[in-house]
Amino acid sequence: MLEDEFGREVSGVRVSLTDRCNFDCVYCHNEGLGDTRGPMDPQDDEMSTDDVVRFLEVVSQFDIGKVKFTGGEPMLRDDLTEIIRRTPSSMEVSMTTNGTFLPGRAGALREAGLERVNVSQDALDPDEFAEITKSGAYDRVLEGVEAAVDAGLAPVKLNMVVFEHTAEYVEDMVNHVSENAGLQLQLIEYMPELTGHPEWNIDIQRVHDWLADIADRVETREMHDRNRYFVGDGMVEIVDPVENPTFCANCHRVRVTHEGYLKGCLNRNDDLRSMGEMTREEIRETFRETVANRVPYYGEYLIKENDEWVLNDKYLDAPTTHS
C-alpha cells in the first residue's frame, strides 16, 4: 500500500464518472471542481468504460481496497453496470447517487457487484427538498432509498448537507434513521470555500454537541478519526472537513475526475495529473507521484497564523500540473 510523506496510506479511490446531473443542488461543489455541471447528454471528455476499468486494475496492485463511484450523477452513465461488473473483485464498491434512478435498477447493480450506496436526501420536507435540489423528485428519491434497501444494499447511508437551508431538519432526519434499521445518516458540513455563500454556514460543533447528548452510545471511526453516534436503530456521523487538520491528517483517498485527472486533495486543483492516453505503466507511475505529493490541506498546505488560515510559504511556487 502506498503512503505519502506524512504517513497517510491510500486505501481507496473516489472516481467521478460524469459531471452531468439531473439535480442542481445549491451547495454542490462537483467533487471540489466548483460549479461545472455539464449538459445532460453524454460527453466525449468522460472517461470510457475501458479507461475506468484500466485505472482500477492498475491501482488494485497497490492494495487499493475500496472504490466509490460519484458524479455528477453516476447513474446517468449507461455503462455503469458494466463498470461495476468489471471492477477488480478485490475492491469494495460503493456509490453516491441522488437515488432517482435506483427504482428498477438497484437489483441489477447489486448483482453486478455494488455493495453500498449513499443517497443524497437533504430534507424530509418536499418543498424544501425542491428548493435545495431544484427538482421535484422528492418521492422518487424515497422510492430509490426503498429500492436500495430491498436490493440488499443496506444499510443505505443518507447524505445531508447541513447549512442554513437544512439545519431545522436535522432532528427530523436523525429521528427518521433512528426508526429505520436499514438506514444511516451522514451529516456533511457545508463548504463555503468551494461553493460560496459563507452566510449559509452554521457551527457544526453545535450538531456534534447535540448528538452527543441524545446518543445511546458514541464510537470513534478510525478513518478520519470520526465519531459515530448511535441513536435508536440508526447511526449518525458528521463529515466536517472545513478547517479541520484532524480530518486531513486521516485522509486515505485519491480522487479521479470524470475527465481522467488524478486529484490528490478535494480542496486543491493545482495538483491535477491527467492520465490521458497513458499506458498501464504510466498510470502506475503517475498514481505513485500523486500519492507521494499529497499533503494535508489544513495543517500543512494551509497553516494557522494569527487565527487565520494562510498558504504555507513552501507551496507558493508549487508547479501547476494539469497535463
UniProtKB/Swiss-Prot annotation:
Entry EC no(s): 4.1.99.22
Which residues are noted in the entry as GTP-binding? 14, 68, 96, 157, 253-255
Q: Where does S-adenosyl-L-methionine bind?
A: 27, 72, 120
Q: List keywords of the entry alphabetically.
A: 4Fe-4S, GTP-binding, Iron, Iron-sulfur, Lyase, Metal-binding, Molybdenum cofactor biosynthesis, Nucleotide-binding, S-adenosyl-L-methionine
Domain Radical SAM core, chain residue ranges per copy:
5-233
Q: Where does [4Fe-4S] cluster 2 bind?
A: 248, 251, 265
Q: Which InterPro entries match?
A: Aldolase_TIM, Elp3/MiaA/NifB-like_rSAM, MoaA_arc, MoaA_NifB_PqqE_Fe-S-bd_CS, MoaA_twitch, MoCo_biosynth_MoaA/MoaC, rSAM
Query: Could you list the residue ranges forming a coiled coil in this record?
Result: none
Query: Some GO term, biological process aspect, for this entry: which one?
Result: Mo-molybdopterin cofactor biosynthetic process
Q: What class of enzyme is it?
A: lyase
Q: Name one GO molecular function term.
A: GTP binding
Pfam families found in the cross-reference section? Fer4_12, Mob_synth_C, Radical_SAM
Cofactor binding summary note: Binds 2 [4Fe-4S] clusters. Binds 1 [4Fe-4S] cluster coordinated with 3 cysteines and an exchangeable S-adenosyl-L-methionine and 1 [4Fe-4S] cluster coordinated with 3 cysteines and the GTP-derived substrate.
Q: Which domain of life is it from?
A: Archaea
Enumerate the transmembrane spans: none
What is its pathway?
Cofactor biosynthesis; molybdopterin biosynthesis
User: Catalysed reaction(s)?
Assistant: GTP + AH2 + S-adenosyl-L-methionine = (8S)-3',8-cyclo-7,8-dihydroguanosine 5'-triphosphate + 5'-deoxyadenosine + L-methionine + A + H(+)
Residues binding [4Fe-4S] cluster 1, per UniProt: 21, 25, 28
- Cofactor field: [4Fe-4S] cluster
The record describes the protein's role as:
Catalyzes the cyclization of GTP to (8S)-3',8-cyclo-7,8-dihydroguanosine 5'-triphosphate.
Q: Which PANTHER family does this UniProt record tie to the protein?
A: MOLYBDENUM COFACTOR BIOSYNTHESIS PROTEIN 1, MOLYBDOPTERIN COFACTOR SYNTHESIS PROTEIN A
Q: Which family does it belong to?
A: Belongs to the radical SAM superfamily. MoaA family.
Q: What is this protein called?
A: Probable GTP 3',8-cyclase
Q: Which organism's genome codes for this protein?
A: Haloquadratum walsbyi (strain DSM 16790 / HBSQ001)
User: Which gene specifies this protein's sequence?
Assistant: moaA
